[in-house]
Design a protein with these regions (language model features):
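Accessory RNA-recognition modules of RNA-modification enzymes
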Residues: 1-249
Length: 255
């Protein structure tokens, strides 16, 4: 295949890290990330090296027969989850195959070992006790957003008010924080322009006590002296500690 070529094919399997092995109707093999076995997808080839082609996913033409699970409203747009549309058992099978493949490639016949199955998580949803959300915008120069990066994008942010891998306290804090800073007109940090204040919102919840720590990561630029403590009051969360962490780091890799 040639660079820039657009084609379609069926995902045969997924190798680590989330590299879908896609075969066209002509039998050509292409790597397309963020795909699920059984999907029919269209893609644009962006790299060809030593006879191996890699491509960018354009569209899921047909869902996989495995995709029967309920998803949050952000799935497919948000880059946080890849396999949420699959039943948990099928998610484990894919991950187990990936680990097994890496073990076989690394060890081969060098020594004998016993490959044990993945141990099930007691929670399928709302299992995260720590999340770091990013401030940004959903599109260039759009309104303030707070959440996860869009799938395949380094810049755009999806506000994940319906995120299912965290519990309701995380979502409440996220939306209260976004509302607060949106009303105050406080900007996120633009790495290319070197302007703005807000970087990340880190939330950690203790499993046994239910206590919550909220850390607002910001730049060291001047800020409007609005009392940040109001944010956790809006969220109406008990046992919540809030503090800010100014970070002097700069980067020129963003818009």
């Amino acid at each position: 295949m040639k660079k820039g070529q657009i084609a379609e094919g069926t995902v045969n399997k997924v190798e680590f890290p989330n590299k879908g092995i896609v075969y066209t109707d002509e039998g050509e093999r292409i790597i397309v990330k963020n795909t699920i076995p059984g999907q029919r997808v269209s893609f644009a080839v962006n790299k060809v090296r030593k006879g191996k082609a890699e491509a960018r996913l354009l569209e899921t033409i047909k869902k996989s027969p495995l995709e029967t699970a309920d998803t949050c409203t952000h799935f497919g747009t948000c880059g946080g989850c890849t396999y949420q549309s699959l039943p948990y058992e099928d998610q484990l099978k894919i991950k187990e195959e990936q680990v097994r493949g890496m073990m076989e490639n690394a060890i081969g016949d060098a020594c004998a070992y016993e490959f044990l199955p993945i141990k099930h998580s007691p929670r399928v949803l709302a299992y995260r006790n720590k999340m770091e959300f990013s401030f940004g915008d959903a599109y260039k120069d759009g309104p303030l957003a707070l959440g996860m990066h869009k799938r395949g994008s380094f810049y755009d942010i999806v506000t994940v008010e319906d995120c299912r891998i965290v519990d309701g306290d995380f979502r409440t804090i996220l939306m209260a924080t976004l509302s607060y800073f949106g009303e105050q007109g406080i900007s996120f940090y633009h790495r290319l322009r070197h302007t703005g204040y807000l970087r990340h919102l880190l939330v950690r919840k203790a499993v046994k006590t239910g206590e919550i720590l909220v850390d607002l990561i910001t730049t060291t630029q001047e800020w409007s002296n609005v009392p940040v403590q109001e944010t956790d009051e809006r969220a109406k969360i008990e046992a919540c500690l809030l503090y800010t962490s100014p970070s002097p780091r700069d980067s020129t890799s963003s818009r």
